[in-house]
Regions:
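Long, low-complexity, Gly/Thr
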Residues: 1-170
Length: 170
């Protein structure tokens, strides 16, 4: 901590699941600790704690002192970048359903932190190793970034997309 005392851990019903280091040779060295809830019903609640190099130690950043809630998108991206299973779910990134919603159109369903996403892509599979970790690139999301889902009473049968400059436009 900034006052020189040792960090006591995530506390409040959370346990550290993993740690990732960034930066090298004393330049911009940062440690990110990911903590998951101990509650059975809340295993998908993840907090991130940021530590910055301070001499030979790492000091907890004030803005993450109580932990920063991690979204499904952030967790998937962090796992892909780190090439590791950071939340202890035995999956590298997004867990892609074995059966495509529409393989020909390129629509799949995936899960991250208990949230279901529709994902546009080709031949998507769950990453079986860190180097194959998949993030939520191609996910269908609402304007606020939350997972898009069809209205109650409807289901998705296929994906039809127009591509302009390799961007889905419709």
């Amino acid at each position: 901590l900034a006052n020189g005392t040792a960090w006591a851990g995530a506390g409040n019903g959370y346990q550290i699941a993993s740690m990732v280091k960034s930066g090298q040779n004393g330049v911009n060295r940062t440690v990110y600790a990911y903590a998951m809830s101990n509650g059975v019903a809340d295993r998908n609640n993840i907090l991130k704690f940021n530590f910055t190099a301070s001499g030979n130690n790492f000091t907890l950043d004030a803005n993450s002192a109580v932990g920063i809630a991690v979204s499904a998108t952030e967790m998937a991206s962090a796992e892909k970048t780190a090439k590791r299973d950071l939340n202890g779910d035995q999956v590298f990134g997004v867990n892609i359903n074995a059966s495509a919603v529409d393989a020909q159109g390129g629509l799949y369903k995936g899960t991250m932190l208990g949230k279901e996403f529709y994902i546009a892509g080709s031949g998507l599979r769950t990453g079986s190793t860190g180097s194959l970790a998949r993030d939520l690139t191609g996910a269908l999301v609402n304007a606020d970034g939350t997972a898009w889902a069809p209205a109650t009473g409807y289901s998705v049968a296929s994906l039809v997309a127009e591509r302009a400059n390799n961007v889905v436009t419709g």
